Amino acid sequence: KAHSRIYRLTANEQKSHVLKPAAIPTNSPEIQNRLNPNKNHHFRNKVYNTLYTDTRGWTWAGTPDGLELFTSENDSAPRIFYRENGLSNNFIQGIIEDKYRDIWVTTSNGVTRIHINPENKNISFTRFNQLDGALDGEYIKDAVFSSSDGTLYLGGIDGFSIFHPDKDSIHPMLPDPPVFTA
């Protein structure tokens, strides 16, 4: 549980110790810097569902409202991508990289593959939905996995999708339907 107060331990007249609230707000920048001196300033006071650093050293930050991209430690501000840019949905659940250095993003409504052109660093988006073989609906926070052969497993509420980068295809894995017997 996060606390909104800082407490100070003081001795009273009976020489016993008393814990009293101090009149210092914990959300002040000075207190945050003292509590988290080595924390990157970009990530303070924000809500992130998932963070992923790819093989380029770029950090992708999934938020409830878009995908942020930090390409270096010196970035003054991240690039931010939304549904209008090509994401399936703005609520980012998971991020993973495939063996071809494409970034896969699971959201609250579908999957997006992000391709970065190695020559000019241009970014393009490909959405996958139920018609492409992806699960319909919401994916689960950080339910992404890459196996040793490069296969990606993307977990959703109703099962998971399997992506084989070599075949450029995505396959849903749904739970087995119930079997009724008499």
Show which residues each predicted segment covers.
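Surface-exposed loop/turn elements that mediate protein-protein interactions on large endomembrane-trafficking
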Residues: 8, 13-17
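Solenoidal tandem-repeat scaffolds enriched in leucines and small polar residues
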Residues: 1-6
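Short, ordered coil/turn segments that flank beta-strands lining enzyme active or ligand-binding pockets
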Residues: 12, 55, 73, 99, ...
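N-terminal/domain-start segments enriched in small and hydrophobic, helix-friendly residues
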Residues: 62
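Residue-level "micro-hotspots" composed of small/polar
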Residues: 20-49, 65, 76-96, 100-182
